[in-house]
């Protein structure tokens, strides 16, 4: 069975490695294949399951009335496990999901939402920072909006699980 058959696909979003369901599915498929090739291997997903369960629990504890926006759709697969509401302006989101540049109107809508206190949390990807994303981050800083940085890959020297734990810990401090 293909991963996409059991994992929710968010249209146009390639950041599936942040989806706990995808992590479970990949680990299960790898363990199954190892055990098929070598019946003495006894490959298990126990460690992955433990990490994933902890991540899901932390995400479920985020405030229910949280409104968030993203400078790039890096956290869709993380935030789908929360009851928070994505308030990223639609035009801005469409531009970034297709790897395009948002219009001046999209930027204005985003900064207005921040200034009007409609955004509790800004999710910012420092690894894909553009001038537009930097301006949005500055507007969020000026408005005292919480900012959580989530990169596409862990910083140098940091392994995935440690980084993912740090990301969910940062979200949990809101």
What is the predicted function of each stretch?
Residues 3-174:
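Extracytoplasmic metal-acquisition and chelation regions
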């Amino acid at each position: 069975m293909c991963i996409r058959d059991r994992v929710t696909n968010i249209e146009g979003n390639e950041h599936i490695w942040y989806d706990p369901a995808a992590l479970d599915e990949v680990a299960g498929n790898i363990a199954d294949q190892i055990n098929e090739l070598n019946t003495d291997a006894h490959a298990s997903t126990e460690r992955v399951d433990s990490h994933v369960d902890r991540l899901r629990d932390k995400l479920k504890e985020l405030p229910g009335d949280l409104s968030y926006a993203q400078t790039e759709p890096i956290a869709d697969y993380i935030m789908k496990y929360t009851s928070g509401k994505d308030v990223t302006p639609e035009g801005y989101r469409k531009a970034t999901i297709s790897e395009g540049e948002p219009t001046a109107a999209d930027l204005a809508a985003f900064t207005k939402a921040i200034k009007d206190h409609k955004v509790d949390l800004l999710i910012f990807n420092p690894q894909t920072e553009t001038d537009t994303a930097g301006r949005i981050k500055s507007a969020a800083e000026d408005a005292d909006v919480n900012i959580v940085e989530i990169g596409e890959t862990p910083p140098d020297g940091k392994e995935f699980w440690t980084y993912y734990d740090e990301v969910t810990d940062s979200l949990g401090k809101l």
